[in-house]
């Protein structure tokens, strides 16, 4: 059975929770062994896949995990706003470190490497692809290229103001267009995750609400202030 078929079966049987194990950069939790522990805990609690950033983290997580890993590399570039897996060598490094699925910024912004070239390199390694999109048009374009997973990852993050609520309308429109939608971005409660599924998402990625202790503590700290 192919990886995609196994993942489809897992989503059908266990629900579509994907956990993004990305600690706050530079925080006490930002260590590969802690990221690996987070990933193992998430998988044991029902996550059908995990999303891991960085080669060292990925190499540490891979031996301990049987569920699929979505791999990314984040960079801060001077000549482009694109941050997620911008280079061909990033794809190569993620493949060699054990990623099953490689996600990349698929927005229609200035970029060092075009989407088709990134997709071709992912296919060269025999891996699945995920397009992190900011708009419906970007998602449909990537779906038409044969990209397996269309994420709403960048919705609300390419403009000056980030909304509080997730973009459920984008989920609905992409689902109606036939995309295998991974809802991602501001799904920080079980109710919002359930709403994404109700709006047609194939799976939902949750990050900060599960793996960023600093964010969770701040939510509670602000709530109990007098």
UniProtKB/Swiss-Prot annotation:
Keywords: Carbohydrate metabolism, Isomerase. One of its GO terms (cellular component) is cytosol. It is an enzyme of class 5 (isomerase). Pathway: Amino-sugar metabolism; N-acetylneuraminate degradation; D-fructose 6-phosphate from N-acetylneuraminate: step 3/5. One of its GO terms (molecular function) is N-acylglucosamine-6-phosphate 2-epimerase activity. It catalyses: an N-acyl-D-glucosamine 6-phosphate = an N-acyl-D-mannosamine 6-phosphate. InterPro entries: Aldolase_TIM (IPR013785), NanE (IPR007260), RibuloseP-bd_barrel (IPR011060). One of its GO terms (biological process) is carbohydrate metabolic process. Its EC number is 5.1.3.9. The keyword Isomerase applies. Belongs to the NanE family. Converts N-acetylmannosamine-6-phosphate (ManNAc-6-P) to N-acetylglucosamine-6-phosphate (GlcNAc-6-P). This is Putative N-acetylmannosamine-6-phosphate 2-epimerase 1. The gene is nanE1.
